[in-house]
């Protein structure tokens, strides 16, 4: 039987870096893909350069790969994700990749938000690709919330969506789950993954400001339209799948320490 080789797209991102670390610890040969200049190889990690948007370099990057963990996403230009998906799937077929594990977001099918529609379309393309697949939806990563609050706090007041619940789940724990899924058999849509506690977005912002030593007023703002209604209806959380362990408070403690 040939050796399992995992390729990680979006390998320099918040989640991708964690996936690399977890795969390396598991002793699995891992290939890290970036569209920028490849980094020097680490023990157990080989860096490759390829561009999902154009398809350049994908055939070489996927050569010999058995499983792809797809973490790449263009949040600034989300429409680019769809041609990226098509290039990824075409190259994966040519390379004979046997399993694609995709990370998605809890609520993408419940909230009519433009970026979420793109995520749903990506899930559909994967499911109809003919390539064995697994799809995991997760709630919000603390590191991304930290970055978002950092941007919002540049203003005199911090505006957050009103009556909107969030459920931060540690990105490292999600990475562990993705590697576990990649080493298993394709499972289709698997149970969602949420953090251990649910919070109002305003409370998350206030606790972040306190932990960072920042003084700002937090102002909840009602988001109009169907997307806002979806946020207020709890579309971003998954109480029945609160399987995460590390809390938001524990994450903030590590940020204070640094």
Residue ranges and their predicted role:
Residues 74-153:
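Glycine-/Pro-rich loop/turn segments that contact NAD(P) or position catalytic residues
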Residues 6-7, 11, 37-95, 105-111:
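NAD(P)H-binding glycine-rich loop region in Rossmannoid oxidoreductase-like domains
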Residues 147-169, 173, 185:
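A conserved pocket-lining segment of Rossmann-fold NAD(P)-dependent short-chain dehydrogenase/reductase
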């Amino acid at each position: 039987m040939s050796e399992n080789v995992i390729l990680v797209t979006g390998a320099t991102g918040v989640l991708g870096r964690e996936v690399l670390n977890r795969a390396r610890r598991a002793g699995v040969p891992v290939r890290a893909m970036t569209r920028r200049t490849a980094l020097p190889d680490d023990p157990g990690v080989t860096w490759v350069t390829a561009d999902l948007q154009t398809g350049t370099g994908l055939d070489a990057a996927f050569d010999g790969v058995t499983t792809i963990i797809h973490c790449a996403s263009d949040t600034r230009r989300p429409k680019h994700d769809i041609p990226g998906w098509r290039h990824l799937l075409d190259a994966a077929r040519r390379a004979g990749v046997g399993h694609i594990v995709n990370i998605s977001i809890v609520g993408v099918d419940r909230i009519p938000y433009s970026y979420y529609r793109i995520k749903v379309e990506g899930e559909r393309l994967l499911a109809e690709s003919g390539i064995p697949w697994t799809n995991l939806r997760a709630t919000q990563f603390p590191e991304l919330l930290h970055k978002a609050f950092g941007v919002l706090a540049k203003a005199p007041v911090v505006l957050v969506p009103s009556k909107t619940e969030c459920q931060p789940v540690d990105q490292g724990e999600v990475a562990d789950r993705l590697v576990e899924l990649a080493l298993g058999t394709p499972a289709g849509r698997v149970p969602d993954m949420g953090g251990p506690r649910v919070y109002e977005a305003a409370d998350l912002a206030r606790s972040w400001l306190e932990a960072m030593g920042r003084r700002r007023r937090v102002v909840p703002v009602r988001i109009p339209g169907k997307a806002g209604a979806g946020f207020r209806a709890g579309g971003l959380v998954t109480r029945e799948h609160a399987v995460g362990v590390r809390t938001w408070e524990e994450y903030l403690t590590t940020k204070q320490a640094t």
